[in-house]
């Protein structure tokens, strides 16, 4: 008679992570359906396919930017330079596209992405090399970008043109689906591959859990940090380019409205604000949820101050809700 093969114990932290991620995605998906059904009471058009596709299109702008923010938060850091990375990129792109040099104008989008990469590089070096806390460094960079933009434009609306490719990406459709949403799906697939299938993804999660342990294991933690901030800067710039195409302009404070929603989308999606845990699926659904909520608040003519209060309250409520499965799992393992 043979004895049964022993089963390997599952680490309680792993159970808690899977439970929390599944709980967050389920809760957010339920919330999305509830918002659509509740919004239909106020505005019947909420249930139409055209409205849902429009919301997915708008969610794409937030989702692309939130992708970069999630990577930084997985490190256990936070990027507060998002608002003026977005605005600065929009100003650069429209000014270059509106130049009278056709060759230079054709480089508007690549140079816009390079702007985001440069800002991300500055942020990464400040955090990884100079050891300044990310919250302080990126906030200072954001203030410098604001000052540079106001100095360059004189405080007036930036002049220039919008690249046709930005307009096509933001407003065009392919097989009935918004191009912006299709682009977001592609970026999401690449992000999932990076997080699940590459050594970079494993290092990213490990750094969020214990940067010192990863350093002692021989990993190049400074390089990982810098690369992550560069990716976040590029994605913020890509979001800015899409926004420029959608609004057909660049304007002062273009990215100001995105800082809180970006953080909210990542956090309510189940990514730990302390780093080391979270999935992109949660961030994806979180961006859709925030977009639907913003749409309903706009229909209700809610003032911007009230929207910010609601965003903050939702973040706190979701964080408290996520403690329930983690506490329950911890209790069963005692």
Question: Positions of the model-derived regions?
Answer:
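Cytosolic-side transmembrane-helix boundaries in multi-pass membrane proteins
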Residues: 1-37, 189, 209, 216, ...
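Alpha-helical transmembrane segments within multi-pass membrane transporters and channels
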Residues: 101-142, 285-289
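Transmembrane alpha-helical segments in multi-pass inner-membrane proteins
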Residues: 236, 246-312
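Helix-loop-helix "hairpin" substructures at the membrane interface of multi-pass membrane proteins
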Residues: 104-112, 118-123, 173-250
């Amino acid at each position: 008679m043979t004895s049964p093969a022993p089963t390997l114990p599952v680490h309680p932290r792993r159970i808690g992570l899977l439970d929390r991620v599944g709980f967050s995605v389920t809760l957010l998906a339920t919330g999305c359906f509830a918002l659509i059904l509740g919004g239909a009471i106020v505005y019947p058009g909420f249930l139409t396919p055209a409205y849902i596709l429009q919301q997915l299109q708008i969610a794409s702008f937030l989702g692309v930017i939130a992708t970069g923010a999630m990577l930084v938060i997985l490190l256990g850091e936070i990027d507060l330079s998002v608002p003026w990375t977005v605005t600065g990129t929009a100003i650069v792109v429209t000014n270059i596209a509106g130049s009278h040099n056709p060759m230079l104008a054709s480089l508007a989008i690549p140079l816009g992405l390079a702007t985001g990469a440069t800002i991300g590089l500055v942020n990464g070096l400040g955090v990884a090399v100079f050891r300044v806390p990310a919250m302080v460094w990126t906030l200072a960079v954001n203030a410098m970008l604001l000052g540079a933009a106001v100095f360059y434009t004189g405080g007036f609306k930036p002049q220039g043109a919008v690249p046709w490719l930005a307009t096509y990406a933001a407003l065009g459709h392919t097989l009935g689906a918004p191009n912006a949403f299709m682009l977001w799906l592609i970026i999401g697939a690449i992000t999932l591959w990076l997080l699940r299938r590459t050594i970079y993804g494993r290092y990213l999660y490990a750094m969020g859990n214990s940067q010192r342990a990863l350093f002692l294991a021989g990993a190049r933690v400074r390089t990982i940090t810098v690369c992550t901030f560069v990716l976040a800067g590029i994605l913020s710039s890509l979001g800015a380019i899409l926004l420029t195409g959608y609004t057909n302009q660049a304007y002062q404070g273009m990215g100001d409205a995105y800082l809180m929603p970006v953080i909210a989308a990542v956090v309510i999606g189940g990514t730990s604000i302390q780093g080391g845990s979270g999935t992109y699926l949660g961030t994806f659904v979180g961006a859709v949820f925030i977009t639907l909520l913003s749409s309903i608040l706009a229909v209700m003519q809610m003032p911007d101050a009230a929207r910010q209060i609601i965003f903050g309250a939702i973040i706190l409520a979701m964080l408290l809700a996520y403690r329930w499965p983690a506490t329950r799992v911890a209790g069963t393992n005692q």
